[in-house]
Each structure stands twice: as C-alpha cells, then as structure tokens.
C-alpha cells in the first residue's frame, strides 16, 4: 500500500479516466437501454429499460460491497491463500482504504480506477440482456444477473485483470475482449439456445 501513496497524481490521466468512466456509463444508460428497447415489441420496451436501470443499481451495489475487492484485491495473493488464483480477497470490501489519496502507479486515484472498472461490471450483464429480451420474467432476470456477476464476471475480472492466474500466464486483455465480450457472449449464446 505504501508504494501506492508514493506515486504523484497525474491530472491528465485522472481527467481522461473520469471522462472514459462517464462514456462507458452512457453506453449502458441510455445506449444499451435504448438499443435493446428499439429491438423489442412495443409492449416490452418499458421492461427492457427497467432491466437496464436495475443492472446499474444492483451491480453498482455488488461492486462497492465486495466486487472490487474480489476482482482487484491482492490480499489472498499476499498471504499465500490458494484462493488467490480465483478471487482477490476481502480487504477492500465497501471500498475500504480506497480514496482519492491512494494513487495507483498510473497516476490516477484508486477510487477513479474502481469506478472505471465498475462501469465494465455494469455493461457486461447489460450486453446479455439482448438474449433475454421478451423471454424471461423480471424476477428471473434479477436472480440471473446477481448470480452471474458473482459467479462469472468477478472471478474472470480477477483472473485476467486483477493478478489472477491468466494474468500471471501472460494473458493481455486491453479492451475487455475476454472479461467483457467473451464472458457476455458465451452467456448470451447459452441463454439464446436455452428453451424456456
């Protein structure tokens, strides 16, 4: 943690990360909400919009409560815990110890990084929504989203971006090809092929 505090704030990087965070949020609401809303029958538009807003609310809560910690904490790796290859740990739950004064090696506050990564956690299940359109009740979608984020997204984010085993093997995922697109694509394919 002390190495994080020795880095100086890069205002240019920080400003760009804040702008990128806002742009990714706009891809979810209104972007995906309106896109999928335009693809369904008129009677289901409100349902799609509501499901997208639900994703933003619930996944944000999961991310703050324990998602960021599971994906990007190094607690388990530092202690030699065998779970380190799957999840990061619990030391950053509820963003404990993360503030504007904790500067990452890239020169941005860790809180800015956490919010940027939260936007990817939001948009990934929103991409899957298209496979569910007009096929599932809201309660079923709620259950799926919560479980999928916990079981599929958070471990994958740790494996590839948070120091997990894929990152240690040399996997590089610059634009979310693995964590976001493959992860959401496989889930959407399974749902699309699933007979209700």
Per-range role (PLM):
Residues 1-196:
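Hydrophobic alpha-helical transmembrane bundles of multi-pass membrane proteins
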């Amino acid at each position: 943690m002390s190495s994080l505090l020795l880095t100086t704030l890069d205002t240019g990087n920080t400003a760009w990360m804040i702008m990128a965070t806002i742009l990714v949020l706009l891809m979810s609401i209104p972007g995906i909400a309106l896109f999928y809303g335009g693809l369904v029958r008129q009677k289901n538009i409100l349902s799609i919009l509501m499901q997208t807003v639900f994703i933003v609310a619930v996944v944000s809560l999961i991310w703050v409560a324990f998602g960021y910690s599971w994906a990007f904490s190094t607690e388990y790796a530092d202690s030699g815990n065998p779970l380190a290859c799957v999840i990061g740990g619990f030391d950053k739950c509820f963003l404990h110890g993360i503030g504007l004064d904790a500067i990452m090696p890239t020169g941005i506050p860790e809180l800015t990084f956490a919010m940027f990564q939260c936007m990817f956690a939001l948009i990934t299940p929103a991409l899957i929504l298209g496979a569910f359109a007009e096929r599932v009740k809201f309660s079923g979608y709620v259950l799926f989203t919560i479980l999928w984020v916990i079981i599929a997204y958070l471990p994958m984010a740790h494996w590839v971006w948070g120091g997990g085993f894929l990152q240690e093997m040399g996997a590089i995922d610059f634009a979310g090809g693995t964590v976001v697109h493959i992860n959401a694509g496989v889930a959407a394919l399974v749902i699309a092929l699933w007979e209700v």
